[in-house]
């Protein structure tokens, strides 16, 4: 029987406790056996100029995942043509790891715009989607409200953003509680976001 692996995509610029709480909750309170935190080199929907280099963001994810046995950093998208789309990554990763059943993890906010994703119908036909709650305007398209391949997980609502953290660091605010200690140390040592 194949292993169920959740894919939690993000720029992780930087990874913060909100990401870890969601990933760990999915690992512990759903039927997913492992969560891969997939560092995206360039999200087609975000400005690239604000991103740290891929290897720095991956290093922060490695540091953040230490001590969480079911959380695994992944750079699977780094060698794919850019800009990349989730449907392409899923096809690539399923071919590379055929003994895993890959599922998407996304916030309710992303589910609301999922129908606009490239080949969203192919994604949902071939992969389950695990959704965690987010506070966001708008509503989920009717076709996804009760879809058989969508599982809603009652994870804590965490309203922390990497944008807020970057801005706070630039303003010399103490954001220690929002970051894993090893991640904060790396950011401080490397003088990032100042």
Curated annotation (Swiss-Prot):
Gene3D superfamilies: HUPs. It comes from the Bacteria. Signal peptide: none annotated. It is an enzyme of class 2 (transferase). CDD domains: NMNAT. It holds the Pfam family CTP_transf_like. Catalyzes the reversible adenylation of nicotinate mononucleotide (NaMN) to nicotinic acid adenine dinucleotide (NaAD). Pathway: Cofactor biosynthesis; NAD(+) biosynthesis; deamido-NAD(+) from nicotinate D-ribonucleotide: step 1/1. Keywords: ATP-binding, NAD, Nucleotide-binding, Nucleotidyltransferase, Pyridine nucleotide biosynthesis, Transferase. Belongs to the NadD family. GO terms for molecular function: ATP binding; nicotinate-nucleotide adenylyltransferase activity. This is Probable nicotinate-nucleotide adenylyltransferase. One of its GO terms (biological process) is NAD biosynthetic process. Its EC number is 2.7.7.18. It comes from Christiangramia forsetii (strain DSM 17595 / CGMCC 1.15422 / KT0803). It catalyses: nicotinate beta-D-ribonucleotide + ATP + H(+) = deamido-NAD(+) + diphosphate.
């Amino acid at each position: 029987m194949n292993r169920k692996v959740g894919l939690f995509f993000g720029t992780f610029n930087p990874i913060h406790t909100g990401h870890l709480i969601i990933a760990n909750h999915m690992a512990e309170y759903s039927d997913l056996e492992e969560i891969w935190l997939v560092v995206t080199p360039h999200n087609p929907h975000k400005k690239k100029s604000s991103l740290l280099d891929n290897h720095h963001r991956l290093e922060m994810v490695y540091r953040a995942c230490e001590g969480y046995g079911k959380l695994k950093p992944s750079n699977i998208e780094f060698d794919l043509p850019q800009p990349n789309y989730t449907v392409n990554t899923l096809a690539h990763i399923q071919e590379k790891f055929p003994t895993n059943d890959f599922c998407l993890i996304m916030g309710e906010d992303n589910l609301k715009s999922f129908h606009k994703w490239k080949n969203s119908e192919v994604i949902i036909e071939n992969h389950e989607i695990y959704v965690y709650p987010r506070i966001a305007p708008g509503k989920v398209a009717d076709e996804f409200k009760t879809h058989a391949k969508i599982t809603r997980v009652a994870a804590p609502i965490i309203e922390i953003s990497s944008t807020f953290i970057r801005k706070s660091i630039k303003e010399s605010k103490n954001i220690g509680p929002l970051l894993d200690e090893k991640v904060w140390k790396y950011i401080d040592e490397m003088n990032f976001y100042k």
